[in-house]
A protein has these predicted regions:
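Transmembrane beta-barrel domains of Gram-negative outer membranes and organellar outer membranes
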Residues: 1-109, 113-227
């Protein structure tokens, strides 16, 4: 899966941040059902997004907001509009960063099957030299509408990331591999390979943000390897 996920932070008058992050994905070799059985296709997936109000306290960065998805109509689209609550807690440390990101997606429109999925992403990354990090950031999901053989997806994996600046543009590059140790019986990929490009884009709707600017902890939260 290749993912482009820009982050657009709005700096508020109180010094906190409103962060919008759409995610555009291209999925390779996704198994889908067809008249002749299952086949693998490579197409654009639905557009997921999160909108978080972010603040810092006692060395933590927190966020609360919503997540959702917009259907693209592709062969692997859910054909649903999704929306639900989310929460973020990030702890930067001397050795790296760790935290968790629980969220829930519920069908609010569309022609696809009913959707009610709760997810928890936990992440733990160790900082190396020159902006490099290594760690893990899998997302565990529970499908409330599935039967007992298909409700849980539990992956484990490893990711390597690099945070750098291209001119004045801060970007995070991330590559990861995951193995589903628990997966739906119907059909699910055993392995997942991900390449992600995440720039922090200067917000065109806020060319002159109020002081203070985005602080280091919030910037770490924006660039954290969350979904």
């Amino acid at each position: 899966t290749a993912i482009f996920q820009p982050a657009l932070p709005f700096v508020l008058e109180n010094g906190n941040n409103l962060i919008f992050r759409p995610a555009f994905s291209y999925v390779f070799d996704q198994p889908i059902a067809s008249a002749s059985g299952f086949s693998d296709v490579s197409q654009f997936g639905d557009i997921s997004y999160d909108l978080l109000y972010s603040w810092s306290s006692s060395g933590w960065t927190f966020g609360a907001g919503v997540v959702g998805a917009i259907p693209t109509g592709s062969g692997i689209s859910s054909d649903n509009w999704l929306l639900g609550p989310s929460f973020l807690a990030v702890k930067p440390t001397d050795w790296g960063i760790w935290g968790f990101f629980p969220f829930h997606n519920e069908k609010v429109g569309g022609s696809g099957d009913d959707t009610s999925i709760t997810s928890l992403q936990y992440f733990l990354f160790f900082s190396l030299n020159d902006g490099w990090q290594i760690g893990t950031g899998p997302t565990i999901t529970y499908d409330w509408n599935a039967d007992s053989e298909n409700d849980w997806t539990v992956p484990f994996g490893v990711q390597v990331s690099k945070t750098t600046a291209i001119g004045n543009q801060i970007v995070k590059l991330n590559a990861g591999i995951e193995k589903n140790v628990v997966a739906p019986d119907d059909f699910a990929s055993d392995w997942k390979f991900t390449l992600q490009f995440s720039p922090v884009i200067g917000n065109p709707f806020q060319p002159n943000p109020p002081s203070p600017p985005v602080d280091a902890a919030t910037r770490a939260a924006v660039l954290a390897p969350i979904r």
